[in-house]
């Protein structure tokens, strides 16, 4: 079953959603529940959001300046982020970074706030639509350093001008871990995990772009992407950044 067909059994699209998205069009949440759809996409407080039909949880939206994300983007905080340390200092004037698995754009926003010019690539049409909406509401100073590529597109005009390629592929939550966060749980329903072959293809593709380094985000206890040992790593309490330097 293709992903678009599978999403018809999982995701309900409420009136007003962007056209052309995969999913099952419904008139309201009640219809989505009647169709046994797990999630709905629609507008909530002028934001394109994802939530469980009939549920009490706050919809998942792309918002760069609210709550914890807003705190992480403050100038005095962003320079201490482990991701920024993993990116290192650019050579010459190469400050462009390709975030090839943009997701909700949270890490891309950190990189942009740190002064990198970030290109966001996201293959999920649902997440891409949510990113586009979030960027429309983001501060102009942040958006100036962020460029959302066409859905599923990762082509850039001058790959040799890249400082880094950033990868944050989906990773299954540990069965013995505490309740998975809402956003990760819902994203896992929308985006399939890469298998071993896809992991190798993703890493090979990223390294072939000619950037100074490839930075891969992983759970701290997870194995290396595709089993390939990095040049070095930056470890935190929950996540680890594996850095593959390129000649």
Curated annotation (Swiss-Prot):
GO molecular function, one term: rRNA (guanine-N2-)-methyltransferase activity
Location relative to the cell: Cytoplasm
InterPro entries reported for this sequence: 16SrRNA_methylTrfase_J, SAM-dependent_MTases_sf
Keywords from the UniProt entry: Cytoplasm, Methyltransferase, rRNA processing, S-adenosyl-L-methionine, Transferase
EC category: transferase
A Pfam family this chain is assigned to: SAM_MT
Annotated GO CC locations: cytoplasm
Its EC number(s): 2.1.1.242
Binding annotation for S-adenosyl-L-methionine: 106-107, 122-123, 168
Record field: catalytic activity: guanosine(1516) in 16S rRNA + S-adenosyl-L-methionine = N(2)-methylguanosine(1516) in 16S rRNA + S-adenosyl-L-homocysteine + H(+)
HAMAP family per the UniProt record, alphabetical: 16SrRNA_methyltr_J (MF_01523)
Protein family per UniProt: Belongs to the methyltransferase superfamily. RsmJ family.
Function: Specifically methylates the guanosine in position 1516 of 16S rRNA.
Protein name: Ribosomal RNA small subunit methyltransferase J
Native organism: Alcanivorax borkumensis (strain ATCC 700651 / DSM 11573 / NCIMB 13689 / SK2)
Taxonomic classification: Bacteria, Pseudomonadati, Pseudomonadota, Gammaproteobacteria, Oceanospirillales
Gene name linked to the record: rsmJ
């Amino acid at each position: 079953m293709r992903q678009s067909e599978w999403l018809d059994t999982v995701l309900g699209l409420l009136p007003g959603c962007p056209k052309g998205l995969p999913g099952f069009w419904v008139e309201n949440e009640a219809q989505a529940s009647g169709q046994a759809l797990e999630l709905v996409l629609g507008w909530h407080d002028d934001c394109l959001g994802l939530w469980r039909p009939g549920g009490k949880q706050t919809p998942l939206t792309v918002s760069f300046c609210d709550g914890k994300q807003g705190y992480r983007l403050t100038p005095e905080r962003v320079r201490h982020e482990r991701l920024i340390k993993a990116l290192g200092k650019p050579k010459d004037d190469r400050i462009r970074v390709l975030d090839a698995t943009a997701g909700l754009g949270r890490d891309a926003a950190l990189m942009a706030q740190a002064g990198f010019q970030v290109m966001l690539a996201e293959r999920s049409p649902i997440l891409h639509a949510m990113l586009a909406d979030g960027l429309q509401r983001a501060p102009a100073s942040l958006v100036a350093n962020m460029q959302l590529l066409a859905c599923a597109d990762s082509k850039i005009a001058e790959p040799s001008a890249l400082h880094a390629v950033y990868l944050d592929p989906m990773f299954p939550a540990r069965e013995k871990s505490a309740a998975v966060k809402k956003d990760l749980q819902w994203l896992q329903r929308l985006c399939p995990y890469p298998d071993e072959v896809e992991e190798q293809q993703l890493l090979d593709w990223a390294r072939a772009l000619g950037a100074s380094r490839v930075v891969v985000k992983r759970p701290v206890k997870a194995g290396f992407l595709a089993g390939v040992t990095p040049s070095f790593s930056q470890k935190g309490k929950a996540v680890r950044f594996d850095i593959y330097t390129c000649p």
